[in-house]
Each structure stands twice: as structure tokens, then as C-alpha cells.
């Protein structure tokens, strides 16, 4: 039987990262590789996010669910919560936050809505 589905395989250790510009201008110290993320389809999809040591994300509001899996390093939210390797984190719609990293991190992000 002929396979009719489309398949895409991404090796996370063999990708090219580009400056993270999801909010317009690139954010210093942040880069990404879009796996299936597409802002024009309502912000649905998956991407790899790489943050260099000392990088900080912009404060943002989640209009849909954002979930991520920590692959490398640590990520810190303003309330002091530290996300570590292996943590799977869910932010529900209506949640706002920003994050930073001391030593850098790699995160696999699953989006179900555009951040504001």
C-alpha cells in the first residue's frame, strides 16, 4: 500500500537556528528553528528555542496554550520558578510571563495560539 501521509523528520541536533523574531525585531540572545510553527495559521505548531546565557524573553500574554519541554539548561520565570531538563510546562490561555536563563537553554515549544 502506498503511503499517502506527509512526513517531516527533524533532527534537533542538526538544525540551523535563526534570530528569534516572532514579535517583530530579533530578541538578543534568542534564536529559533521552526519545525511546524506558522504564525499565519493562528500561531499553531512547534519550534526549537535556543537562549544564550543571560538571555531574557519579552513579557507576553498567551492567547492559547503554550507548552514546552526543557531539553538543555534551565529557564527561570519572574516568580523564581526554575524549569529544568525534562520538565514539561503548560501555560494556559490568559497566562502572562517572561523568562530568562543564566547559563543558556534549549527548549522544544508547542504553540496553540499567538502570543501578544
Segments (PLM) and residue ranges:
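Ligand-binding loop in jelly-roll beta-barrel domains
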Residues: 93-116
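Glycine- and acidic-residue-biased ligand/ion/polar-headgroup-sensing regions
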Residues: 53, 62-78
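Short acidic-glycine-tyrosine-enriched beta hairpin
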Residues: 77-97
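Short glycine/proline-enriched turns and hinge-like loops at secondary-structure junctions
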Residues: 43-44, 61-63, 81-82, 101-103
Amino acid at each position: 500500500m502506498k503511503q499517502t501521509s506527509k512526513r517531516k523528520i527533524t533532527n534537533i541536533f542538526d538544525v540551523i537556528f535563526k534570530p528569534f523574531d516572532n514579535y517583530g525585531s530579533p530578541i538578543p540572545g534568542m534564536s529559533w528553528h521552526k519545525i511546524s510553527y506558522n504564525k499565519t495559521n493562528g500561531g499553531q505548531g512547534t519550534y526549537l528555542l535556543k537562549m544564550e546565557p543571560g538571555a531574557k524573553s519579552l513579557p507576553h500574554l498567551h492567547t492559547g496554550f503554550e507548552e514546552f519541554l526543557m531539553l538543555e539548561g534551565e529557564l527561570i520565570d519572574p516568580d523564581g520558578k526554575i524549569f529544568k531538563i525534562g520538565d514539561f510546562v503548560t501555560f494556559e490561555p490568559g497566562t502572562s510571563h517572561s523568562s530568562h536563563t543564566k547559563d543558556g537553554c534549549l527548549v522544544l515549544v508547542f504553540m496553540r495560539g499567538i502570543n501578544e
